[in-house]
């Protein structure tokens, strides 16, 4: 008789035996099964929710145990749709944690059907509201040494975890209480994204870095951020409080902290890291009073909470929520008088309908209809106000940007103007049309200042116009908010290290004009170039090794520098950053980044806004004509530009 060790999704811990089987035979069968399934038994981890069985992979000559699809919350369906997450019910059998979970409900990007450069960001599993699951990668040796069940601090065999120190890169690392844990939060504009994407595979990071890596799904779009509480009587506030996607993240992080020892990790040695909306999520989890102090080390890639796309007011979120209700034929006018009826209606609407209809409120480049909301609870105030009273003396931050943050979004929002493969010679009138569209919510004075700042005065005007718009988008929405926030973090006591990724990878499928795209650094930080089956150049493999090392060193020490390497802390007074590049001729340290351009956004433009507000008033005082006002602005910018040449950045 063949005996299979394959397990169903949940197996009972014991099965009733027929009374006619003699006890000696039972023992023989038990010993035989133990021998056959012994390897699989090593893959069972006792968590606080129940036992889970993963799978073993060998990477770079090292064994890693991988657990995918561990539920951390009840499926947020039916009455739980739009509500805060509820912890998963414990299970008693062994849970099969070898398959990928569903992706939270979202729409696919299909502007370029069949194009792999776009497809890598689309869901690679079925979409479902039942999506709140965790993934864990744990080095096998460390997990078997330190892994302890959540109920006793011991190994399954009853022995205490040993106190050996592991060696990494020749440096002794004190892992007596377990390994460091890195927790990844994916991006996608709070509208899309999935922890299951191939680019987020952490096999190499866990194996080479000798760290535990985890990731999880969280709700996006209206399912994660519908905010209606202010419109309803107080007793209905929990029907759609908003920010439940952030509450999902918080619950997953707490679950991982509670179960760190079970996987061989140290719950006091945790680092959050993420990119774009995932980076802003890291920011939110570090700063929110709900999770403050839960983790004190974070890596933020191309995204901070002060970015225009990364937060919205309660009023704006309510406006968008009411529009969605009406688009779903559930009558938002009844929210105050009959909220139960409205929410019952919204919970009866097909998930696909909500997923599609929510995009009706997309209002222009990087103006997504869902974002973290200033709700008075998870986010009590706007990000920079929260920063004013923050005490961050024990916090370590690694943050940065890529060189061409804006081109990806420019292409998608103005697809009728640009080609993904070839550069476009853009006439001045089209340039002005696009710039006025992007910055249409700014005052006229601000728009004129922005256009002046990003007008090319040399070279081929047509191609330069395209490049300058990309720079304006990248600076405004990503690099300069990051720059501003990094300075504020340092001022509040955090230890901040800043990087700037400038390498255009040889594997890029996008046109040369798009440069170093938003998200291009992810594969390098995850160590993908170390995978010899992938087509990277030798210098790129070295860069991948260096960048993975920076992540690991930061997770272990709070400082991304390698032994003997200089990487000073970043501050407003000394804005030193580290350049990740394959070009050995480039100095690794510089000042900025983009200090002059970011001074325009962070220091000068707010003054233009205040001046415009003064002149636009309808008081009896004399006002400056728009023409003189704009000439004055242009003159001031010119003076600033002249002064820049005497500064070192």
From Swiss-Prot:
Its main location: other. Proteolytic cleavage into the 16 kDa subunit and the 55 kDa subunits originates from the hydrophilic peptide, aa 148-180, and is associated with excretion out of the cell. Disulfide bonds join 104-131, 330-345, 480-598. The lineage of its organism: Eukaryota, Metazoa, Ecdysozoa, Arthropoda, Hexapoda. Rapidly hydrolyzes choline released into the synapse. It can hydrolyze butyrylthiocholine. Keywords: Cell membrane, Disulfide bond, Glycoprotein, GPI-anchor, Hydrolase, Lipoprotein, Membrane, Neurotransmitter degradation, Serine esterase, Signal, Synapse. Residues 620-649 form a propeptide. Belongs to the type-B carboxylesterase/lipase family. A lipid is attached at residue 619 (GPI-anchor amidated serine). GO terms for biological process: acetylcholine catabolic process; acetylcholine catabolic process in synaptic cleft; chemical synaptic transmission; choline catabolic process; choline metabolic process. Homodimer; disulfide-linked. The active unit is formed by non-covalent association of the 55 kDa and 16 kDa subunits. It is a lipid-anchor; GPI-anchor. InterPro entries: AB_hydrolase_fold, AChE-related_enzymes, Acylcholinesterase_insect, CarbesteraseB, Carboxylesterase_B_AS, Carboxylesterase_B_CS, Cholinesterase. It comes from the Eukaryota. Its EC number is 3.1.1.7. The gene is Ace. The keyword Kinase does not apply. One of its GO terms (cellular component) is side of membrane. Glycans are attached at residues 126, 174, 331, 531. The keyword Chloroplast does not apply. This is Acetylcholinesterase. Changing residue 531 to D: Decrease in apparent molecular weight of the 55 kDa subunit. The active site is at residues 276, 405, 518. Residues 1-38 form the signal peptide. It is found in: Synapse; Cell membrane.
